[in-house]
Amino acid sequence: MEELHEARKDDRTEFQRDYDRLIFSAPFRRLQNKTQVFPLPGSVFVHNRLTHSLEVSCVGRSLGNDVASQLLKKHPALADSHISEIGSIVSAACLAHDLGNPPFGHSGEKAISTYFSEGQGMALKKELSPMEWDDLTHFEGNANALRILTHQFEGRRKGGFVMTYSTLASIVKYPFSSQLAGKKSKFGFFLSEEADYQKIAGELGIIRLSKPDEPLRSARHPLV
């Protein structure tokens, strides 16, 4: 991840830039080709992942602003903090919450997992560590979202989207690795991003629930 970038001179906060950066990104625009519900014939309105994410983001911003307002009324001393940015952080996290979902949603996750556990992908098992293999055989869209946002892909600068740690932590609904996924196969980060998540959690003071010699499990960020 890129930890710092040159200071900007516009009036947007870093959290507002997170939202804007997502809106104009190719991964977010591709959500328009992924259905949120099974498509129906005729004139029935069908949501795709893009419209769903925009709607969720609007609701998240409103709820976040309400929470910030109530906190400031109860704790006026927080006025000089970033508490007023809760709405911006939550709206950006909502915007990104489906970013890692494959086509066909949970069925797509199952198809990817099955390719490695039962299909031709089994040939790769000997090339991977047990933890890497768990990531592939329990493919998870939430973990893939964090990968998209933090990973350096070809042609993109180091740090991926270069988002704030608060926004990144707010999309991690399941703050543990695939080793702890259980039957529901839910987890928050792949092995390739575990060190990044540890860095984020450490900087934000997120409590680690597991022992040092156990697979990583953390508390959730309060804005998840």
Q: What residues fall within each predicted segment?
A:
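Membrane-entry segments of alpha-helical transmembrane domains in multi-pass membrane proteins
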Residues: 46-50
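Short hinge/gating elements
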Residues: 39-45
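Sequence-structural signature of the catalytic-core scaffold of metal-dependent phosphohydrolases
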Residues: 1-11, 23-34, 43, 54, ...
